Amino acid sequence: MHIKLVIFAILLPSSLLLLLMGTTNFQQGYVEAQTNSTQVFTSPNHTFSLNYPLDWEIAPRNSTFPYYGETTALVLRPIMNETVTPLNEIFFSISVSDVKRLLEDNKSLPAEFLDKLVADKISSFEDPSSIYGNLNVKLLGNNYTRLGDHPAKELTFLTQNLGTFEVDTYTIYNDQLYHVNFMGPQSKVSQLYEEFQQIKDSFRFLS
């Protein structure tokens, strides 16, 4: 599982590369053993699947930590032997939203929609009225990538006043906006970024 970070050198911006170097009973889906090190999650409507490590778990919906929103389809987190707090929380989430009407109203192609979505988020980093406005956000990467063999956009940034590292990946598939989010303490990035990439790379659309 510990793949040398040099593998990612040609794929990551230099600032990010330097940073890297320095509930089984889930009612809305199911998991099954796949190998000795991962298990499979398939969404309840069989629209996507992914693999995640055995030392991760599906976050419970009744948790005191606000993992789930209206559009959240899945949240994964490492199994921890300590109390979870906003300062040590690590998670990988997938949210799905219907954007068919927005695409039609704006007469936008999916790629154009994603470009604007990402541009607006970057602008919010400097907007005092936004949730990021006073958090001293440092942008590490704004790149094209793929999610489930589908074109995607990816933002990587530090929220320096909170000490968190975050990756947002967006793609549109069948008029649905898929948002993959990874968040964790900046101090643990080098330990967990590879696992995040492995989970993301295993993502597949099923229908």
Please tell me what each predicted stretch does.
Residues 1-10:
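N-terminal Sec-pathway targeting helices
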Residues 9-19:
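Hydrophobic membrane-insertion alpha-helices, especially the h-region
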Residues 19-35:
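Sec-dependent signal peptide cleavage junction
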Residues 31-75:
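N-terminal "mature-domain start" segment
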Residues 56-58, 176-207:
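Surface-exposed amphipathic alpha-helical segments
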Residues 62-172, 178:
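Conserved polar/disulfide-associated segments of primarily extracytoplasmic proteins
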